[in-house]
Amino acid sequence: MEKEKAQLMFKLAFSKRNWGAKYDRLEHFKRFQNLDKIVKELNKINWLIITKKQNYTGISLNTKFKKEIVEFIELYMPEVRGWIK
């Protein structure tokens, strides 16, 4: 499941650039089998920001933990080392 966490955070960080107040809909990440569990665990350690909008739930990465998040992604996905700035 750590690999899935890294993949979700990589998608938010690299592809969508969802850091801080830039949110993406939770429903856009349905392909992750353990999505609810992953989101709950990442939110518990404050790496993920969850906001309830009127029509959807938005998620974003916490900029306060950018260094730790990038290190985690590179640990479980070494092929993307250096891609996230």
Where are these regions (language model features)?
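Short amphipathic alpha-helical interface segments
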Residues: 1-29
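Short, well-structured alpha-helical interface segments that form or flank functional binding sites
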Residues: 3-7, 34-37, 59
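Intrinsic-disorder-associated interaction segments
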Residues: 28-31, 62, 66
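Minor-groove-contacting beta-hairpin "wing" of winged helix-turn-helix DNA-binding domains
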Residues: 55-62
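Short, amphipathic alpha-helical interaction segments positioned at domain boundaries
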Residues: 64-85
